[in-house]
């Protein structure tokens, strides 16, 4: 199989994600880092048989697109395995990319020791935590590295899958949570659950697919009705249905001691608006309240369902107004009202 078009396309996605926010000089350095990583890893393959270079490119894409970090961090992501797995040294990196990148690459490189103080894995954890004092960008690269490894874990042996998934759940997901990377934390937890509890994950995924198919048309009509109501009052917004992930469903089932089909709020409808498209000079909170007032004129609100998570945000800083509205089909729908900025802040 010719992987060259895949490699080039993935690398271009990194460049495109960075282009709006870095200088042409920095873009040249990023491209230079990509070419060095591609040359250094050329002979290497992943367990799946794919060229190894796909991994550092994917990590760089997470850093550039999902975490929105700077050029030097993306360069570090491209080079994060170069010193560990190829003849290149930290001094080589310093000569080409400067002290900042060299320092970051040195921190993310697993240190080879003859004797480990405890175990190799525990020493690695200690190195990651110690890097928090050096530069948090290094930890961001390590977490991105783990996220891509979890997304491609299917190529590993079952015992390795279980080991890596356990490490992810116990160390990397809580670390991502502490750093405020709530979307990454959720991804890591869900992927870990997929490999640690394969049967439960498979059952819930199948039930979710069935539930979505059974309710899709009704929810599409409800979203269309909501969007139409708001459009009539000059409010442009997105109205979408979001289904909770298997790990979130499983955790809620355990907490509430119910089966899947008796679990409430398996999905929610989110109304998202952009401040710069609003004609009225209102704050985000005022716009949320305006949308709430408009909707409760046209739809029946379930008594006692209103929750103001703008004044009292969730742990992940997610802010919204929550309520239950009655659809034309007579179903109470879980609705969340928020701005695009509120969503981004929680991720």
Locate each region found by the language model.
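Nucleic-acid processing machinery
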Residues: 1-23, 38-44, 53-66, 70, ...
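Generic alpha-helical secondary structure signal
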Residues: 9, 28-32, 36, 100, ...
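Short, mixed-charge amphipathic alpha-helical segments
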Residues: 17-33, 90-100
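Generic alpha-helical structural context detector
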Residues: 35, 61, 103-107
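Active-site alpha-helical segments that house and flank conserved acidic catalytic motifs
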Residues: 73-81, 141
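Hydrophobic or amphipathic alpha-helical targeting/insertion segments
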Residues: 78-85, 89-107, 181
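Transcription initiation cofactors for RNA polymerase, centered on bacterial
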Residues: 104, 108-113, 135
């Amino acid at each position: 199989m010719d992987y060259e078009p895949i490699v080039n396309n993935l690398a271009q996605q990194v460049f495109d994600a960075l282009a709006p926010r870095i200088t042409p000089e920095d873009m040249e350095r990023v491209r230079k880092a990509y070419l060095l990583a591609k040359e250094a890893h050329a002979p290497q393959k992943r367990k799946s048989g794919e060229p190894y270079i796909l991994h550092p490119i994917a990590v760089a894409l997470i850093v550039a697109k999902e975490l929105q970090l700077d050029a030097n961090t993306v360069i570090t992501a491209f080079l994060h395995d170069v010193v560990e797995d190829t003849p290149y040294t930290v001094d080589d990196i310093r000569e080409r990319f400067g002290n900042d990148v060299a320092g970051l690459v040195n921190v993310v490189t697993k240190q080879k020791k003859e004797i480990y103080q405890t175990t190799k894995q525990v020493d690695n954890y200690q190195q990651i935590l110690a890097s928090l004092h050096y530069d948090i960008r290094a930890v961001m690269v390590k977490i991105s590295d783990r996220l891509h490894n979890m997304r491609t874990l299917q190529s590993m042996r079952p015992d390795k899958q279980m080991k890596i998934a356990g490490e992810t759940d116990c160390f990397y997901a809580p670390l991502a949570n502490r750093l405020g990377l709530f979307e990454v934390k959720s991804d890591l937890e869900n992927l870990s659950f997929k490999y640690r509890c394969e049967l439960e994950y498979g059952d819930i995924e199948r039930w979710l697919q069935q539930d979505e198919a059974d309710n899709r048309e009704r929810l599409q009509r409800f979203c269309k009705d909501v969007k139409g109501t708001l459009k009539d009052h000059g409010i442009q917004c997105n109205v979408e249905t979001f289904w909770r992930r298997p790990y979130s469903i499983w955790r809620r089932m355990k907490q509430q001691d119910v089966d899947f089909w008796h679990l409430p709020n398996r999905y929610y409808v989110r109304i998202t608006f952009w401040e710069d498209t609003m004609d009225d000079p209102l704050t985000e909170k005022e716009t949320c309240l305006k949308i709430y007032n408009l909707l409760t004129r046209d739809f029946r609100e379930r008594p006692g369902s209103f929750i103001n998570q703008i004044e009292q945000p969730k742990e992940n800083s997610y802010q919204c107004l929550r309520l239950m509205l009655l659809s034309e089909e007579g179903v109470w729908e879980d609705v969340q009202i928020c701005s695009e900025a509120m969503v981004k802040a929680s991720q």
